[in-house]
């Protein structure tokens, strides 16, 4: 059985009520059924700066690492410069082997509290950096930002904080990524 590692931030941790959950991990496992074992080593609140410190947690015998970092990096209140994000993501992909890079997740555009830290230009900038780095390393890039932007009744996909996803949002997220994982492992 193949082994998939989820390596990201609170989006991959199914963050809810102030704590991590197995919601996203379970959705990936359900979608991959008996095809692959899913292990989640994501760290809520982490940027690519912390991700570099967590690289040693990735099991040596993994078949694919799904990298989902960028939203915390892009935040103006606690993030990093785009150049540093690019440098860190390059280093991560150089060290982990076979991977898929997930683009940035769109915060709820109706939530002014969370959006004070983002904005479309900044999200697009960091998303483009992730896309560029993925191309440089010849790894698949899953651009989820446009899919989230097209949602109707978008607030139903988010918790009250405007950043973390509801059950509906988590299902949507995982359904955007599963085809890429299956393609990579076939």
Predicted stretch roles:
Residues 1-44, 50, 54-61:
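Serine-esterase "nucleophile elbow" of acetyl-processing enzymes
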Residues 11-15, 42-46, 73-74, 108-109, ...:
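Short histidine/acidic/glycine/proline-rich micro-motifs that form metal-
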Residues 52-186:
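Alpha-helical cap/lid subdomain in secreted, periplasmic
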């Amino acid at each position: 059985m193949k082994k998939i590692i989820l390596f990201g931030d609170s989006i991959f941790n199914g963050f809810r009520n102030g704590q991590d959950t197995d919601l996203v991990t379970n959705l990936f496992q359900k979608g991959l059924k008996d095809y692959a074992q899913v292990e989640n080593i994501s760290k809520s609140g982490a940027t690519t700066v912390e991700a570099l410190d967590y690289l040693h947690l990735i099991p040596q015998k993994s078949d694919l690492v799904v990298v989902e970092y960028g939203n915390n990096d892009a935040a103006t209140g606690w993030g990093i410069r785009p150049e540093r994000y690019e440098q860190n993501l390059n280093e991560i992909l150089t060290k982990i082997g076979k991977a898929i890079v997930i683009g940035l997740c769109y915060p709820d555009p109706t939530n002014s509290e969370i959006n004070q830290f983002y904005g479309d230009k900044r999200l697009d900038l960091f998303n483009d950096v992730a896309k560029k780095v993925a191309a440089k390393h010849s790894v698949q890039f899953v651009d989820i930002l446009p899919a989230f932007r097209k949602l109707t009744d978008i607030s139903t996909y988010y918790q009250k904080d405007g950043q973390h996803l509801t059950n509906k949002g988590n299902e949507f997220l995982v359904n955007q990524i599963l085809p890429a994982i299956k393609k990579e492992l076939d």
